[in-house]
Swiss-Prot record:
GO cellular component labels: cytoplasm
Catalyzed reactions per annotation: adenosine(37) in tRNA1(Val) + S-adenosyl-L-methionine = N(6)-methyladenosine(37) in tRNA1(Val) + S-adenosyl-L-homocysteine + H(+)
Example of a GO MF term: tRNA (adenine-N6)-methyltransferase activity
Organism: Shewanella piezotolerans (strain WP3 / JCM 13877)
Gene Ontology biological-process entries: tRNA processing
Record keywords: Cytoplasm, Methyltransferase, S-adenosyl-L-methionine, Transferase, tRNA processing
Disulfide links within the chain: none
The keyword Repeat belongs to this UniProt entry's keyword annotation: no
Protein name per UniProt: tRNA1(Val) (adenine(37)-N6)-methyltransferase
Length: 241
């Protein structure tokens, strides 16, 4: 359903995955302010790209395979204040990698598919958006390694299990995790999501630390209200904050 933010509007009626707290959290958390060229992998309705456009002066390239989602995405781009900085390409990231200039993006954002060989969704569109069948972690990391500049960063959000699986594959792609945030939906509950900040390995990779800083974030307090930390992150976007 259509969703209005403070500076832009999202129509996601044709998109397999609607606007979600995961997407808003990632778009608000990713360190984008100094970025010049941003890549949004699996753009969906364009939420992350639009948040990135609001938070930076970067040129943003959005990749979306599904034609219906791409229609929503392009419409949302056209109606935004930043349409001249937003470019949508309707293709897979695998196809994009065959023609794109290597190491040309200083930030990559992605809210990846996160069901791996699990039960398929009732909606075919939703299934494509949520399953790793169309984009495995190996393919995602291959793309990040190929397209990210040497000093660049990639920001992702995944369920805990998926995040741990992805972290185990970083080394083989010459990538490393600089920071992770464990996200709990409600105070007192176990974290169920993880934000990851990934960078290329330095030349002295063998001497790099194998651990990374981990912090915690709670979305809602026990009384059901948004936490102060979440409000601080998202207040530039949500109308009622």
């Amino acid at each position: 359903m259509p969703f209005s933010f403070k500076q832009f509007h999202i129509d996601d009626r044709r998109c397999g995955m609607p606007v979600s707290t995961d997407g808003v959290l990632l778009g608000a958390w990713a360190p984008l302010s100094n970025s010049k060229n941003i890549l949004d992998i699996g753009a969906g309705s364009g939420l992350l790209s639009l948040m990135a456009a609001q938070r930076s002066k970067a040129n943003i390239t959005a990749i979306e395979l599904d034609e219906n989602a791409a229609l929503d995405c392009q419409s949302n781009f056209n109606l935004s204040p930043w349409s001249k900085r937003l470019t949508l390409l309707t293709r897979s990231i695998q196809q994009f990698c065959t023609t794109a200039k290597k190491h040309s993006f200083d930030h990559i954002i992605c809210n990846p598919p996160y069901f791996d060989n699990g039960p398929q969704s009732n909606s075919a569109l939703r299934a494509t958006a949520r399953h790793t069948d169309s984009l495995s972690f190996d393919e995602l990391l291959t793309a990040i390694s190929s397209l990210l500049s040497p000093a660049g960063q990639a920001s992702l959000i995944l369920p805990i299990t998926g995040a741990n699986q992805l972290l185990q594959q970083l080394e083989q792609h010459q990538l490393t995790c600089q920071h992770a945030v464990l996200v709990a939906s409600v105070e007192g509950k176990k974290p169920n999501r993880q934000l990851l900040l990934i960078t290329p390995c330095r030349s002295n990779f063998a001497n790099q630390a194998t651990t990374h800083p981990v912090s915690n974030l709670v979305i809602r307090n026990t009384d059901g209200h948004y936490s102060d930390d979440f409000i601080l992150l998202s207040k530039s976007f949500y109308l009622k904050l």
